[in-house]
Amino acid sequence: MNKTIMALAIMMASFAANASVLPETPVPFKSGTGAIDNDTVYIGLGSAGTAWYKLDTQAKDKKWTALAAFPGGPRDQATSAFIDGNLYVFGGIGKNSEGLTQVFNDVHKYNPKTNSWVKLMSLAPMGMAGHVTFVHNGKAYVTGGVNQNIFNGYFEDLNEAGKDSTAIDKINAHYFDKKAEDYFFNKFLLSFDPSTQQWSYAGESPWYGTAGAAVVNKGDKTWLINGEAKPGLRTDAVFELDFTGNNLKWNKLDPVSSPDGVAGGFAGISNDSLIFAGGAGFKGSRENYQNGKNYAHEGLKKSYSTDIHLWHNGKWDKSGELSQGRAYGVSLPWNNSLLIIGGETAGGKAVTDSVLISVKDNKVTVQN
């Protein structure tokens, strides 16, 4: 009898270890956004187009349910956050009424109770793409991202060039062959108050802005990890925003994913351990840039990291690996762990699965 019970226990443990974290997303999902509220996950945009879905993680029969479509058109690199039961979506990259790719600076609100969207009469003072968003004391905070005028101008130039390959090569060379500071990535910190729908200046980085950083916050601290310093060039920097007391303090932690860094990585916290995983970048680009080659990633192949790093005792330790490199998915806090939904793998392939990264006693567990 005891042997039977033991065999059953082993079988159940094996099943749990191999069970999917969440059901596959309804479509391959990358470059979108997502948020979690009361154990219900919401994802949308990116490769899902205007579609949004939700999933109750506590339901016995877990499944994705389609929601009302986003009214602002398909978008990549939007961000989202829940505040007081409503979902707010900030900016992104999409097509304007003339069919040109552009950065948006608008805000949409979704009401889960009525399954309805509304575009707010509120525009951020700068474009929002490649930015990060986090919530602190009932307000949304936005920082980082590309410069709206420079980014939009690049795509206007490409549109003018049409199919003229010579003109396109010239435009690309002109766009990428500049120093990082010449792209004016956003280093300002903006706050959005949903009660007034107003934007305010909340501070600025003493260093530089990034695009495609990973963000995670807990209590009065928020961490911005890696990201682009300019198009094609990542940074290995880690910034900490400390809201303790009345004055916001910016701190710089030891770098991670050195020397080249990554963008589109995933960040979370498990049992008070800060986690950074995945991301994509160009190996050798940092050396090229330091040697005076501004078009630092020219001719280099994008690589996808499998590394999982933990911040421990004041330094980063590589503590595990993903089953495959991935980037540009959604990372959310769930079950005291880091939940990764979707993303892209080598070649830019969008995926439908989820990954759960947990930490206990500085040991990493990865569940696919």
UniProtKB/Swiss-Prot annotation:
One Pfam entry name: NANM
Assigned keywords, A-Z: Carbohydrate metabolism, Isomerase, Kelch repeat, Periplasm, Repeat, Signal
Catalytic activity: N-acetyl-alpha-neuraminate = N-acetyl-beta-neuraminate
InterPro entries, sorted: Kelch-typ_b-propeller (IPR015915), NANM (IPR056734), NanM_proteobact (IPR019936)
Compartment(s) of residence: Periplasm
Kelch repeats: 40-84, 86-137, 139-173, 174-219, 222-265, 287-336, 338-367
Main location: periplasm
Signal peptide: 1-19
Enzyme Commission number(s): 5.1.3.24
UniProt-recorded Gene Ontology molecular function terms: racemase and epimerase activity, acting on carbohydrates and derivatives
Active site, renumbered: 228
GO cellular component: periplasmic space
HAMAP family, A to Z: NanM (MF_01195)
Subunit structure: Homodimer.
Summary of the function given for this chain in its UniProt record: Converts alpha-N-acetylneuranimic acid (Neu5Ac) to the beta-anomer, accelerating the equilibrium between the alpha- and beta-anomers. Probably facilitates sialidase-negative bacteria to compete successfully for limited amounts of extracellular Neu5Ac, which is likely taken up in the beta-anomer. In addition, the rapid removal of sialic acid from solution might be advantageous to the bacterium to damp down host responses.
Similarity comment: family membership: Belongs to the NanM family.
The protein's name: N-acetylneuraminate epimerase
Origin organism lineage: Bacteria, Pseudomonadati, Pseudomonadota, Gammaproteobacteria, Enterobacterales
